[in-house]
Amino acid sequence: MSPPRPRASLSPLTLLLLLGGCLLSAAGRDKGAAGREVTRASRPTVGSSGRFVSPEQHACSWQLLVPAPGTPTGGELALRCQTPGGASLHCAYRGHPERCAATGARRAHYWRRLLGALRRRPRPCLDPAPLPPRLCARKTAGSDLHSPAHPSLPARPSEPPRSRARSPARSRQSVRSPSSQPEKKPLLVKSNSGGRKAGSDPVPEPPAAAGFQPNGLDQNAELTETYCTEKWHSLCNFFVNFWNG
């Protein structure tokens, strides 16, 4: 049989050193976790986000930045809007829901109500008026949502003034005005005294003479053909012309 081996025994000093090392490592881990929690609490956490279009067709996207639990320092509602003309606007609304007695711990209800009021605004990033929460029975200082900075739209180039278009009635009056019509010259009528006087009636033409008949020759030819025969045609024609002169 082999002789029994002696058991190794730990000294009390070694045990104390091991115990102290374990305690130091545990304390270091606790300190690091506490530091990380403080850092998280100091930074706002990103809440819900979404999009909406205002009554004046401003396309906006919003994002809610709320503080970490245990730090009642208010919250911020960040907006980014684009106007119908293409201009980009950025703004933020800040408020303190904890100062409204009606909300209490229901901060989400507070922000939901204010977001609904913001959607009804024609120009969310250009309206300087604060957003009052309707759910607060009594208005307290800091319960409204304020915008610290209000951006402005880019200046548009000035357009030259346009001449007003004339109405059809005025144009017709200008065309038909007496000044634009040509003047009519009065007619001159010879009076009995030998002078001329102005008149509107035309001068009547003198009647033809009673004895002048332009168709006398034609009438003689008709009489000759009627009363003269072929045998005595030349002699009868002479007498007819002599008689009618």
UniProtKB/Swiss-Prot annotation:
Primary residence: secreted
Record's keyword annotation contains Signal: yes
Residue segments, region Disordered: 33-52, 136-216
Any single GO BP term: positive regulation of nervous system process
InterPro entries: FGF1-bd
Cysteine pairs bridged by disulfides in the record: C60-C81, C91-C125, C228-C236
GO cellular component: extracellular region
Disrupted-gene phenotype: Mutants display a range of anxiety-related behaviors including reduced time spent in the central area of the open-field arena, reduced activity in lit areas of a light/dark transition test and prolonged latency to feeding in a novelty induced hypophagia test which assesses the drive to drink a sweetened milk solution.
Record localization: Secreted
Region forming the signal peptide: 1-28
Tissues of expression: In the adult, highly expressed in brain with lower levels in ovary. In the embryo, highest levels are found in the brain and spinal cord at 14 dpc and expression is almost completely restricted to the brain by 18 dpc. In the adult and postnatal brain, highly expressed in the orbitofrontal cortex where it is concentrated primarily in differentiated neurons.
Bias (Low complexity) ranges: 170-180
Protein keywords: Disulfide bond, Growth factor binding, Heparin-binding, Secreted, Signal
Gene Ontology MF annotations: fibroblast growth factor binding; heparin binding
Subunit relationships: Interacts with FGF2.
UniProt xrefs under PANTHER family: FGF BINDING PROTEIN-RELATED, FIBROBLAST GROWTH FACTOR-BINDING PROTEIN 3
Family: Belongs to the fibroblast growth factor-binding protein family.
Role description: Heparin-binding protein which binds to FGF2, prevents binding of FGF2 to heparin and probably inhibits immobilization of FGF2 on extracellular matrix glycosaminoglycans, allowing its release and subsequent activation of FGFR signaling which leads to increased vascular permeability.
Name the UniProt record assigns to this protein: Fibroblast growth factor-binding protein 3
Source species: Mus musculus
